[in-house]
Amino acid sequence: MPIIYTNIVLAFMISLLGMLIYRSHLMSSLLCLEGMMLSLFMMSTLMALNMHFPLANIVPIALLVFAACEAAVGLALLISISNTYGLDHIHNLNLLQC
């Protein structure tokens, strides 16, 4: 396995570890989730370039669309929680009533 793939997998694992360690704060969890999505995007882009298959180029773009939707929903939840409670703790998500 080339060194670039090893670095991308290592970046994903570090982001996953950060997600597990800092799971009590929403902002830290969102940043770790974005790091995971970035490493998945880089891995899928490299795989699509190595496959030389024209339809494989759609996968990284679709992944970016899902990452943007995830970021928008996460930031909306963060703003809602911080305006209501003044903190960004995850346990405040259970207290939101729509």
Curated annotation (Swiss-Prot):
Transmembrane segment boundaries: 1-21, 29-49, 58-78
Catalyzed reaction equations: a ubiquinone + NADH + 5 H(+)(in) = a ubiquinol + NAD(+) + 4 H(+)(out)
InterPro entries: NADH_UbQ_OxRdtase_chain4L/K, NUOK/Mnh_C1-like
Keywords: Electron transport, Membrane, Mitochondrion, Mitochondrion inner membrane, NAD, Respiratory chain, Translocase, Transmembrane, Transmembrane helix, Transport, Ubiquinone
Subcellular localization(s) per the UniProt record: Mitochondrion inner membrane
Pfam families per the UniProt record, alphabetical: Oxidored_q2
Record's bilayer topology term: Multi-pass membrane protein
UniProt GO cellular component terms: mitochondrial inner membrane; respiratory chain complex I
Keyword match Ribosomal protein: no
EC number: 7.1.1.2
GO molecular function: NADH dehydrogenase (ubiquinone) activity
GO BP: ATP synthesis coupled electron transport
Family according to the record: Belongs to the complex I subunit 4L family.
PANTHER family: NADH-UBIQUINONE OXIDOREDUCTASE CHAIN 4L (PTHR11434:SF0), NADH-UBIQUINONE OXIDOREDUCTASE SUBUNIT ND4L (PTHR11434)
Quaternary organization: Core subunit of respiratory chain NADH dehydrogenase (Complex I) which is composed of 45 different subunits.
Its job: Core subunit of the mitochondrial membrane respiratory chain NADH dehydrogenase (Complex I) which catalyzes electron transfer from NADH through the respiratory chain, using ubiquinone as an electron acceptor. Part of the enzyme membrane arm which is embedded in the lipid bilayer and involved in proton translocation.
Protein name: NADH-ubiquinone oxidoreductase chain 4L
Gene name as annotated: MT-ND4L
